[in-house]
Amino acid sequence: MNILGIETSCDETSASVVQNGRVTSNIISSQLIHTSYGGVVPELASREHERLIVSVVDAAVNEANIQKNDLDVIAATAGPGLIGAVMVGLCFAQGLAYVLDKPLVPVNHIEAHIFSGFIHEGPDHDPPKEAFISLTVSGGHTMLSVVQQDLTYQVIGRTIDDAAGEAFDKTGKMLGLDYPAGPVIDRLAADGDPGFHEFPRALTSQSRTSKSYRNNFDFSFSGLKTSVLHYIGKQDPSYIERHLQDIAASVQEAITSVLVEKTVAAAKKYRINAISVAGGVSANSGLRQKMAVACEANGLRLYIPKPVYSTDNAAMIATFAHLKLSRGTTTPNTYDIAPFASFETQG
C-alpha cells in the first residue's frame, strides 16, 4: 500500500511516501522567511505553503519512484496547527484525493508525533505491543501521555504556560541568538558548563513546592524565562558574550532535567517499562543523552526518532495513517478540517 503524507501545520511544507509501512521518500521545505521576524508569521506561512506544496509533493512522489496513480491513500495533517497552514495542506490533499479517486485519511498532528519514534526505513518494524509513556515536546506542545497497545491514550500532564520549545526560543532571543534558537542553544551548550548557573526548575523535586506536585506531571517554563531575563539584565554584555556557551548549557540543563525527571516518574507511577520521546525538541542532543542515561538506569526501553523525524515532517503523517489503517482504527474518506482540534478528542 502506497500512502502519500502531507504536513503543513506550521512552517514546514513536507510530503512523504510510505510503502507498506516503510518510508521511501520524505521531502521537507523549511520556511526561512520567518527568521527575520523572530517567529512564525501565520499569513506568511500559509502563502509559502501555497507556493511550495505542488513541487514538494511532486518531489516526494518522484523520489519514491512511483506515479501519482500508484498511490492508494492520501493522508494529511488536519490539526492542531495554524488554521491557514493546515487548510493549505488539507485542501490540497482533498483535491488530489478527488482527482485520483483515492481515499483521504486526516491525521492528528500530535498523534503522528507520538508514534514518530517508530518510523522506519526498512521492513519488519512496528510500535511495541505494550503500553508506553509518551513525552511530546515541541515549540507549541509539551505533554505526557500514557499510550495503550490499541493506540488509545490518556494525557496525564501538560504545560500550564509555555512549551519547552518556546522556552528554548525565547531565552535564546534574550541572548541575541537567531530564530529558531533551540538548535543554536544545543550547539552552544555542547561546549558549555551545564552547572555554570542554576536556573529554576518548576514543579519538580527541586522546587520549593515539590510536595504539592509530587504526583503532578504538568510542566511550567515561564519562571525559567523570567529568571533568564533577570540574570541577563544584571550582567555586563561582555560577560554574557564571554559565557554564552555556559549560559546556553545551563538553560538547556534546566529544561531537559525537568522533562526527564517527570517522564521517568510517570513511567514508575504507572508501572510502564517503555518511554517514547517525540516532537521538535526531541532532536536536542542534551535531552536525548540525558533521557538515554535515565532510561538505562531505571530499566526502561527508550524509543526516540531520528533527528530528521523529530521536527515536523510528512513521514510521520503517512506512517501513522498506515498504522491506523493496518490496525483498523480509522475510516478513510473523512474530509473535516479541524485546525484547532484538541489532542484528546482525536484519540
Swiss-Prot record:
Binding-site list for substrate: T136, V137, S138, G139, G140, D169, G182, D186, N284
Record EC number: 2.3.1.234
UniProt keyword annotations, A-Z: Acyltransferase, Cytoplasm, Iron, Metal-binding, Transferase, tRNA processing
Cofactor(s) in the UniProt record: Fe(2+)
Molecular functions (GO terms): iron ion binding; N(6)-L-threonylcarbamoyladenine synthase activity
Broad class of the protein's primary localization: cytoplasm
Family matches, as InterPro entries: ATPase_NBD, Gcp-like_dom, KAE1/TsaD, TsaD
Record text on cofactor binding: Binds 1 Fe(2+) ion per subunit.
Pfam families given in the database record: TsaD
Function noted in UniProt: Required for the formation of a threonylcarbamoyl group on adenosine at position 37 (t(6)A37) in tRNAs that read codons beginning with adenine. Is involved in the transfer of the threonylcarbamoyl moiety of threonylcarbamoyl-AMP (TC-AMP) to the N6 group of A37, together with TsaE and TsaB. TsaD likely plays a direct catalytic role in this reaction.
Family: Belongs to the KAE1 / TsaD family.
Name of the featured protein: tRNA N6-adenosine threonylcarbamoyltransferase
Organism of this sequence: Chlorobium phaeobacteroides (strain BS1)
